[in-house]
């Protein structure tokens, strides 16, 4: 590629990425400006809803984070390494593909008044669950699958497998292996995953509306309600509540770091003292239960759904917005990985490491300033801020694993950088690209706040309809919306899996 053309491409690439990440700036300004006034803080803390909302947020977030971690560790201790672990990992995409709103809707239909399990667990219904315990438990089950998916990549390292086999052969229990080897080895990946889980659990609005306490709601929901009001004082309280969510995230990070440091001091040396093996029944049970929750979710929604009431406009909007946002993100990320900077890319991960509410507020501020609110383009642009980092999460490790010797051989043959990109790197990246496309579509179709705010309510999607119907109405209509919100990502996952299998069959002669 000629040098002027390459520079033009790099400039265009930076400009497009900057447009997507530009809301980070107004988001910061929205939070900083009211935070400088003591009067605004006094008005926030004087609100009678704040203490209970804060307590419900802390309880639900703690249950979600700690519960997801415990479930993941129990499953790892019970199954890894071995064929059962491989089978469980193969079934995880069935749960990962289910959007949070669809999963929460199925839980609501089970535990709400009149649900199948209402008589057995009445306390977990939203009207009675003032502390968000049901919300936290639902998020713990859903996020444990994500945590297992992240850790599965780290646990596949050959040296880690060899060391676990050695400890097992020497008679050390599985919990000793977990404490002495696994946790220190997976700590970096585990820390980033837990940060994403805590940030999302703190700021989740759609799932909290469906399953969380109603009066007062969680801090994220009450902040969202204040931000959407026309009164400037209420908007200021909403901005400060969003800042309070970020302060809570920082407190969780600090507490987790201190607990980690304290735990590290308790790790003894491998001194030959064995401990008796502990029963692995809880981990085995959870390993069976996790994939089944996805199947049960589909079955329950399919039984209750009234297909004659499906909103075709919401279905078309969800499909087109998800596909367009995913295609744009995929094209930008492939070009970014090739011609973008190789270092200092931490800012790309900020949308999944920070609470979503202030970021959406920044998007809305920018859209109002540019007079783009209420447009289809603005909604797709809003989705990209979350679709891109999740797809990058899949693509970047695979890109870094490309064998540099292949690139060197192509360069010795006189191939240009563009030719190497299209004929060497892109074919090698086909399977990760398909996985990233499926994940990106699932993330895009699940967006609630960007769709509602940037679209000004003009573009209904399956997610916005399901959240609206969860407050009251026909269970059949609610189940139908949630079922199609669940089926679309599953169809995309299935299609990408079939394409990957077909490509593997076609390329088997190259092995």
Swiss-Prot record:
This is Inner membrane ABC transporter permease protein YnjC. The gene is ynjC. Its main location: membrane. Residues 30-62, 113-130, 211-239, 306-318, 367-374, 454-485 are periplasmic. Keywords: Cell inner membrane, Cell membrane, Membrane, Repeat, Transmembrane, Transmembrane helix, Transport. PROSITE patterns: ABC_TM1. Signal peptide: none annotated. SUPFAM superfamilies: MetI-like. The chain crosses the membrane at residues 9-29, 63-83, 92-112, 131-151, 190-210, 240-260, 285-305, 319-339, 346-366, 375-395, 433-453, 486-506. Probably part of the binding-protein-dependent transport system YnjCD. Probably responsible for the translocation of the substrate across the membrane.
């Amino acid at each position: 590629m000629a040098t002027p053309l390459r520079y033009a491409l790099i400039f265009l690439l930076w400009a497009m990425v900057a447009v997507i990440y530009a809301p980070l700036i107004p988001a910061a300004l929205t939070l900083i400006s009211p935070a400088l006034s003591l009067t605004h803080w006094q008005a926030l803390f004087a609100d009678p809803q704040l203490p209970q909302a804060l307590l419900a947020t802390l309880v639900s977030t703690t249950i979600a984070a700690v519960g997801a971690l415990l479930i993941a560790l129990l499953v790892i201790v019970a199954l890894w390494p071995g064929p059962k672990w491989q089978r469980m990992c193969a079934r995880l995409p069935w749960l990962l593909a289910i959007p949070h709103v669809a999963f929460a809707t199925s839980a609501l239909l089970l535990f709400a008044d009149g649900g199948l399990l209402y008589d057995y667990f009445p306390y977990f219904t939203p009207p009675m669950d003032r502390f968000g315990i049901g919300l936290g438990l639902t998020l713990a089950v859903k996020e444990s699958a994500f945590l297992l998916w992240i850790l599965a990549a780290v646990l596949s390292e050959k040296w880690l497998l060899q060391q676990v086999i050695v400890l097992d052969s020497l008679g050390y229990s599985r919990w000793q292996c977990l404490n002495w080897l696994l946790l220190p080895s997976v700590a970096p990946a585990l820390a980033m995953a837990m940060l994403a889980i805590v940030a999302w659990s703190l700021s989740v609005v759609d799932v909290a509306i469906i399953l969380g306490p109603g009066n007062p709601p969680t801090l994220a929901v009450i902040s969202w309600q204040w931000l959407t009001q026309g009164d400037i004082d209420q908007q200021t309280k909403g901005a400060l509540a969003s800042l309070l969510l970020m302060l809570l995230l920082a407190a969780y990070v600090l507490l987790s770091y201190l607990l980690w440091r304290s735990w590290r001091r308790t790790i003894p040396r491998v001194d030959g003292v064995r401990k008796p093996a502990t029963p692995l029944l809880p981990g085995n049970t959870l390993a069976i239960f996790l994939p089944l929750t996805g199947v049960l979710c589909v079955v329950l929604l399919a039984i209750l759904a009234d297909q004659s009431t499906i909103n075709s406009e919401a279905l078309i909007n969800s499909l087109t917005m998800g596909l367009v946002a995913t295609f744009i993100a995929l094209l930008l990320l492939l070009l970014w990985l090739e011609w973008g900077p190789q270092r200092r890319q931490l800012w790309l991960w900020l949308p999944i490491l920070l609470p979503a509410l202030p970021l959406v507020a920044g998007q809305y501020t920018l859209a109002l300033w540019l007079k783009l609110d209420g447009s289809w383009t603005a909604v797709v642009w809003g989705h990209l801020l979350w679709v891109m980092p999740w797809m990058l999460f899949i693509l970047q490790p695979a890109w870094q694993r490309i064998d540099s010797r292949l690139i060197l051989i192509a360069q010795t043959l006189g191939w240009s950088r563009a030719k190497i990109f299209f004929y060497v790197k892109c074919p090698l990246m086909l399977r990760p690209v398909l996985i990233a496309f499926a994940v990106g579509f699932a993330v895009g179709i699940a967006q609630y706040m960007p769709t509602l705010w940037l679209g000004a309510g003009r573009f209904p999607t399956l997610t916005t309809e399901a959240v609206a119907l969860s407050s009251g109405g026909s269970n059949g209509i609610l189940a139908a919306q949630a079922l199609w919100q669940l089926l679309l990502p599953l169809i995309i996952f299935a299609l990408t899996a079939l394409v990957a299998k077909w490509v593997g069959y076609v390329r088997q002669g190259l092995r």
